[in-house]
Amino acid sequence: MATISFSERDLMRGKNVTPAWYRVKIETVGEAPAKASEKGPSTNYPVEGTILFNGDTGDTAFKGVPLDWNFNSKAIGFAVGFLAAFGVEVKAGTRFDLKSAEGREIDIFVENDTWQGRLVNRVNHKYRAVRPEVTAVAAA
């Protein structure tokens, strides 16, 4: 018998959010070779985070929704805003450990997009520092 089970996180993965700024906890940052391309070898830096609450209103309606996105060594400039949101001053020639973001919180604008014919949540590299005056407010 092919028996499977789902975690709460698995079930939340398919939940579409209303486009907005969300407070997100960075769960993991990885590193893996990207698929071969005509541009040559590159490295992906996959990031997984979890929505905590709306970054403007504190609403927790989408609490627990996981988000996945990538940085790539061929377009690493997209990581500048990510690092800046943590207060890092990004300078040419300086090395940064993306993994140091694990466990930290950031505000991310989450959009909706269509991928392979279905609606998905999309992180399009819009980041800002956490606004400490905004805290979680339980959904009514």
Segment roles from a protein language model:
Residues 1-140:
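Short beta-rich binding modules
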